[in-house]
């Protein structure tokens, strides 16, 4: 086994189409990563420069956070790929449980009095 270390390895078993697909996927992930950095900078700049009115700042940042969360789920957690039916079902059911719970807590605690 140690004698074979000086020999070069065989080419990968990937086809040219698979290599193109992987390169395309890497490009997509880089673009999405840059978009998420842009969204983060946009939320920081919106607060730091007072461009957004105070009454709209929190909803604006929340909207950007939801967009960023969706991008992370679909591109970096690979939820857009097939065979993730159970994971998608759990995520959707979690959202349907979380949103009414947060809304009820806001009403109960009186947080909506801004």
From Swiss-Prot:
List membrane-spanning regions.
29-49, 56-76, 89-109
Primary site of residence: membrane
Superkingdom to which the source organism belongs:
Bacteria
Pfam families for the chain: COX4_pro
Where located? Cell membrane
What are the entry keywords? Cell membrane, Membrane, Translocase, Transmembrane, Transmembrane helix
Q: Name one GO cellular component term.
A: plasma membrane
Give the reactions, separated by semicolons, that this protein catalyses.
Answer: 4 Fe(II)-[cytochrome c] + O2 + 8 H(+)(in) = 4 Fe(III)-[cytochrome c] + 2 H2O + 4 H(+)(out)
Instruction: Spell out the disulfide connections.
Output: none
Please cite one Gene Ontology biological process associated with this protein: electron transport coupled proton transport
Keyword Transmembrane present in the record's keywords: the answer is yes
Top EC class of this enzyme: translocase
E.C. number(s) listed in UniProt: 7.1.1.9
- Keyword Phosphoprotein tagged: no
Q: Name one GO molecular function term.
A: cytochrome-c oxidase activity
Topological type in the membrane? Multi-pass membrane protein
Q: Which family does it belong to?
A: Belongs to the cytochrome c oxidase bacterial subunit 4 family.
Name assigned to this protein:
Cytochrome c oxidase subunit 4B
Q: Provide the organism lineage as a comma list.
A: Bacteria, Bacillati, Bacillota, Bacilli, Bacillales
Q: Which gene encodes it?
A: ctaF
